[in-house]
Swiss-Prot record:
Name by which UniProt lists this protein: B1 kinase
Induction trigger: Expressed in the early phase of the viral replicative cycle.
Recorded catalytic activity of this chain's protein: L-seryl-[protein] + ATP = O-phospho-L-seryl-[protein] + ADP + H(+); L-threonyl-[protein] + ATP = O-phospho-L-threonyl-[protein] + ADP + H(+)
Keyword Magnesium belongs to the record: yes
Amino acid sequence: MKFQGLVLIDNCKNQWVVGPLIGKGGFGSIYTTNDNNYVVKIEPKANGSLFTEQAFYTRVLKPSVIEEWKKSHNIKHVGLITCKAFGLYKSINVEYRFLVINRLGADLDAVIRANNNRLPERSVMLIGIEILNTIQFMHEQGYSHGDIKASNIVLDQIDKNKLYLVDYGLVSKFMSNGEHVPFIRNPNKMDNGTLEFTPIDSHKGYVVSRRGDLETLGYCMIRWLGGILPWTKISETKNSALVSAAKQKYVNNTATLLMTSLQYAPRELLQYITMVNSLTYFEEPNYDEFRRVLMNGVMKNFC
C-alpha cells in the first residue's frame, strides 16, 4: 500500500502527514512526517511486532524513569528512544498499526561500510560501553533486547557521539514480579533475531536473558573490528542448526574463536567474551566489571 501523502490520526487526535519512505526492516517501514523531528513506523496490525514495541515504549521507556536511572547509576546517556504517539489506520482490506518516534541519523552499519567494514579498536570499545549501558537499563527493567546489531544502532542527528539502540520488536520480558522466567524451551522462540548474532539460548528456544544480549554484543564487536565469524557464511544459507552448532563449538574456546575471526584479537575482547560464557542463564552480570574491561581497551588506545 502507498502511504505517502496519507494523514494519520494518533491516540491524542494529532495529525501526521506521511512523507517518503526512508527505511524498511523486519519490523515495519519508516517514513518521514510533516515534523522533521519525528518519523512514523508502520506495519500491518496482524504482524504483532509493532504492538510489542508499543507496549515496551509505554511500559518501560518513560523519560522520567530513564532520567532517574541515569542519575542513580551516574551514567550520562542511555541510548533508547521514546514514542511520541501511536495509533491505527484502516484501509479497505488491511488494518495498520503505526508509531511516531524520534528521527535519528545514519545507522552504525552504514558507518562501518563507509569505513571499509572496519572500525578502530578504541571506537569499538566505546560503542560496546554505550550499548552495555543501554542494555543494563533494559535488563534492570526486566527486559532483554534480543536483536543487537549494527543496523539497529543509530547515531543522533546532531551529536554523532550519541548512539541509540532501536527496534524493540523482539524484546522479551525475562523478569516478572522479581522472578526470572524458567529455563523452558518454547519452539515459537527458536532462532529469534538475526541468525549471525542470535545467542545460543535463542537458537534452543529459550527466552533471551541478560547473558544472551551480552553474547550478541560480543559477536557484534568482533564484526565491527573487521572480523569474520566462523558461522558468518553459514548464516547466509539460513541453516540455523549449523549456525547454532558452530557457536556451541566455541563456547569453551574463546581464544580459538577470536584467532579464527580476527587477524588481531584485543585482549579485552577475549576477557569480555570469556566473562559472558561464564554466566548462567539466570545470573545478573557485573556490569561494572564488563565496563571496566572495555574501558581498558579504550584507554590503551587513547591518543
